[in-house]
From Swiss-Prot:
Subunit structure: Heterodimer of subunits alpha and beta; disulfide-linked.
Family: Belongs to the snaclec family.
UniProtKB keywords: Blood coagulation cascade inhibiting toxin, Disulfide bond, Hemostasis impairing toxin, Platelet aggregation inhibiting toxin, Secreted, Toxin
Role of this protein: Thrombin and prothrombin (F2) inhibitor. The IC(50) of thrombin-induced platelet aggregation and fibrinocoagulation is 62 and 35 nM, respectively. Its inhibitory activity is at least 10-fold lower than that observed for other thrombin inhibitors.
Disulfide bonds: C2-C13, C30-C127, C102-C119
UniProt-annotated location(s): Secreted
Keyword Electron transport: no
C-type lectin domain: residues covered: 9-128
A GO cellular-component term linked to this record: extracellular region
Any Pfam family matching the protein: Lectin_C
Major place of residence: secreted
PROSITE patterns reported in the protein's UniProt record: C_TYPE_LECTIN_1, C_TYPE_LECTIN_2
Source species: Bothrops insularis (Golden lancehead)
Entry protein name: Snaclec bothroinsularin subunit alpha
Length: 132
């Protein structure tokens, strides 16, 4: 069972945090909230829809982005994208690549797309963890 202020979906618990942090601080914060916690990763359309609904309910109208756990990592000359929880990107909803290395959900009317933006930006975020 998830803690009372977290929302269950599948085998994980999710929580939207309103406070704004950069990507690295948000990832660290998630890992401190729960054992095995990370910024949210998505493994299916259903999981993405669930999180988008959670964010849509809670996010302030002035906020345009919410961090997710996807970051482009440079390994020697190869560029790979991995979720912050270590899972590989088997499921993508991404358009284009630039020097902006960290991904967030972007509010486009009611639909959230994944967009890569500068990692130092301060944004709210979603944590995902296994149940305690």
């Amino acid at each position: 069972d998830c803690p009372s202020d977290w929302s269950p979906y599948g085998q994980y618990c999710y929580k939207f945090f309103q406070q704004k942090m950069n990507w690295a601080d948000a990832e660290r914060f998630c890992s401190e909230q729960a054992k095995g916690g990370h910024l949210v990763s998505f493994q299916s359309d259903g999981e993405t829809d669930f999180v988008v609904n959670l964010v849509t309910e809670k996010i302030q109208s002035s906020d345009l982005y919410a961090w997710i756990g996807l970051r482009v990592q440079n390994k020697e000359k190869q560029c790979s994208s991995k979720w912050s929880d270590g899972s590989s990107v088997s499921y993508e909803n991404v358009v284009g690549r630039t020097v902006k290395k960290c991904f967030a959900l972007e509010k486009e009317q009611e639909f959230f797309v994944w967009i890569n933006i500068y990692c130092g930006q301060q944004n709210p975020f979603v944590c995902k963890s296994p149940p305690p």
